Amino acid sequence: PEYFFASLYVTDWESLFREFERKGNKIDILVSSGGVAPPEVSSPALWNLLINYGPSFPLCALFYNHISSEPYNPIVKRIQGDMHFFLNQWGYYDDEINQFNNALHNIGAGVPPMSYNQIDTDMPAVIVGGGPSFDMRVEEIKRHRDKVLLISCGTSVHSIIAAGLMPDIHVEIESHMLTYDHLSKIDQPEFFENTLLVGALQLPPQVFNLFKHGYYFLKDSTALASMFGTEDEIVHRATPTCTNTGVAVATHLKLKSVFLYGMDFGFPEKNQHHSKNSIYFSDKMSDSIKEGVKRNLEKLVETESVHGDPMYTFPMYNTSRMSIEQLTKHRAIYQKTESYACSEGARIANTEYLTPDAVDDFFTTRKDIASTKFLKALKGTPFTQKQMREKINKLGAFLTEISRSFSVCLNSLKSTEPEDVFRVCHTINLNLLQQVFPKYGLTAYFIRGSIWHYLNIGCAHSLSIENKASRDKFITEWKSNFGKFLEDLPAHYDSITSKQYPDSEDPWVRNDIVSNEHLYAE
């Protein structure tokens, strides 16, 4: 802050601010107190300012560290590293409507929400990911199986069952049909009969249909969260992988002790990226999963193991680990609960690493748990058909309103010059952030991703196409397509949601989003 205070002697900030405001521009000054805060504190504060400047951020982000101040270098580096992740998290309408349709099928079928009002939080939970070190340490889980709540995450369930174990809870997060594909390959009726599915509301309805008992949860940063739940009912940081989901659910339930197995987020050898008994080394692995593994192996990066040794990881695993570290930090600081790392992979911050002997010592005096009572207590009250239809109509009214307001703003664009394109795009973004989000809350996520993608594409090409005739052609077509999207949005939404839920004949729930492309064009 001393730099800013000193600048007051030589800089007339008021005149600068007024000149920027006169042109419709803006300057933000972020002043810290008590010196420069560490990157994990400073970066989010700066980040929350920058994301209000879309599409200029991240498209035109230029970082100038005045007088090369050393404390600011890690802050800038962290934000630069998160920019691509930011772009990949925007989402888009096609995926949102697909998830929403899945959610309506699940609610219409009477799937109840997960509740947590009267549960035993002292119950230790073992949460299992699909990392290769699960094979090394599975025996200690077997020794203490009756003393823990066993939670499988996504594809890790194949390794758990292959080891002769059966989870109490299985968690899933993805709305893609690959979720159904991998679960449908399990030939153990006992799993579907006795294991409780805790899945995101937007799971394909076929997934809930596989299980005798299934409850849904609401993940953060989605329109579904504000439509079908309260803030206290939203599960935070459940993405990007099912492993995150398992830890997020345990954190949401405020379980006092969690043990993280198979959460390696890295591997010592390039061909040891998952447990040997996982679906990734099975002849049942689908072509889609094979292609995904192949692409990931081309983008390996190095990280540090829990023992301080170098190891390999995928960018997605790195992101997943960082997200879990936010959960373990929340558990340690705010919940005063314990997170134990029982994996032999990458180091996970805010956890205590336990050897097999230390795990045995922990459970020596522990008694067997009453998991059945715990699982029954998680069942909430499902929505009625009438309540569901009211939510559908409310979202439809929201889409109609923003379609009109954004169309008016877009039609004010009379030139293809970059400055004019940016001006209109910034106006639309400010409308979204300052008008739509305050009024509709998380519901705005339903359309935010597609709006941001359109704005980013228009501005990026207005800058990159130097030939005026080519730029005129592209921006004119971009404006037309953007306007048509906004115009058709309410009618398309109504065409999808006007059915009676659940509807076994609905083609949307029989394929994944790629296979449904022909339906989006109708």
Residue spans for each PLM region:
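N-terminal donor/sugar-recognition subdomains of glycan-related enzymes
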Residues: 1-128, 132-149, 158-171, 177-199, ...
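Surface-exposed acidic, glycine/proline-enriched linker/cap segments
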Residues: 226, 287, 291-308
